Amino acid sequence: MQNLNKTEKTFFGQPRGLLTLFQTEFWERFSYYGMRAILVYYLYALTTADNAGLGLPKAQAMAIVSIYGALVYLSTIVGGWVADRLLGASRTIFLGGILITLGHVALATPFGLSSLFVALFLIILGTGMLKPNISNMVGHLYSKDDSRRDTGFNIFVVGINMGSLIAPLIVGTVGQGVNYHLGFSLAAIGMIFALFAYWYGRLRHFPEIGREPSNPMDAKAKRNFIITLTIVLIVALIGFFLIYQASPANFINNFINVLSIIGIVVPIIYFVMMFTSKKVESDERRKLTAYIPLFLSAIVFWAIEEQSSTIIAVWGESRSNLNPTWFGFTFHIDPSWYQLLNPLFIVLLSPIFVRIWNKLGDRQPSTIVKFGLGLMLTGASYLIMTLPGLLNGTSGRASALWLVLMFAVQMAGELLVSPVGLSVSTKLAPVAFQSQMMAMWFLADSTSQAINAQITPIFKAATEVHFFAITGIIGIIVGIILLIIKKPILKLMGDVR
């Protein structure tokens, strides 16, 4: 950890290294959300269209995007482990950035499904290496008693939201309006900017932070790791081949099914590992039990929220009025632009929630109440999406304002769940499993998208109203259940609120 002189040259009163990490994450999120804004459209756009895509069925395209999201969050476990045991955070971040860049370059090439799967593999692995470690690097810029720490993280989050906000406008406009591969090229350029900002800034401002692994492997452990990794890769390749041989025509669907199972099983293994560990005390085991309903609730929340890049993206392209007339002026909307509504409402609503919590102080709702209310709002956002179909049927086009309203309500729900969930994950973590509990929070998102890979193909015009209604009601019911069982959960949580 770096000891910083508060009189040195700063970035908004913060360590200069924060500017480097701010810029790196800004451009990384720009590339990630820019690519994600057009990915599903590229997958199902006709191969004969002027702006040709891969021509996959919409159901399969949505499943691929979902499983991609699941694996991105699953890979954060690998990224954290590589930084802690092998390379150190600094080199892991840079290597991750290189892999992401190569992935976007692969997407920019017109080689069909082959380049798609190579690209997604590289981006998944690279994001897993970069995402968890760059947040840890922010923390290492400060001493434990530095009062600037929380403000520094807030500034860092602003960089994330800024990159997420402008990406759909730039990458989406070029990708959908001109050429998908050109859009992916812009995402690659964004990652090149991220790499340059990180490489240059790290050398100048924090050359020693994260340089070495915090828990390095000895020679014997490295040898065992190489042997294990080799075996895993061989088994994976054999499994890949067997899945293909079983049914070449259904290979993609079968592969998605296998990955969905992995995404669901991994968190179960993690929970069993922690519950059965001799390093976990009885009091910690009670707190871990309290985390289970929160984890399951988080899966429901993220399952709805993450459908913005699949179901909501498809609805926006096929069902919303893309040429609305407002105040006498006719506008054109690229469907990918809807993806900016998520970060936009996060930016707009965050100060309101911060002010409310500051005003309430110790009187603010408990974690369980916030979770429950957040889930109810998230479920309500999908009930809103039933109204266009109920009022005017599902064959025509509806106002884009339905999506604006849906995102506004859903992001209010996210601000009640996401920051609280991240915080409570650390508070309820057993001492011996602090980092693993942070991974568990990411795994909730991973599991939700693994489930989405199975349920999003159900969505079509004929099922639109029922899908939104059932999914929304599930979210509301889970929120209500949390409020009902609040007392026993709080009892298990002990002094954590």
From Swiss-Prot:
Name of the molecule in the record: Di-/tripeptide transporter
Localization in the cell: Cell membrane
Cytoplasmic side: 1-36, 84-92, 135-154, 201-224, 274-293, 355-372, 445-497
Species this chain originates from: Lactococcus lactis subsp. cremoris (strain MG1363)
Top-level taxonomy: Bacteria, Bacillati, Bacillota, Bacilli, Lactobacillales
Keyword DNA-binding: no
Gene3D superfamilies, per database record: MFS general substrate transporter like domains (1.20.1250.20)
Biological process terms in GO annotation: oligopeptide transport; protein transport
Cellular component, GO, one term: plasma membrane
Keyword check for Transferase: no
Its biological purpose: Proton-dependent uptake of di- or tri-peptides.
One Pfam family recorded for the sequence: PTR2
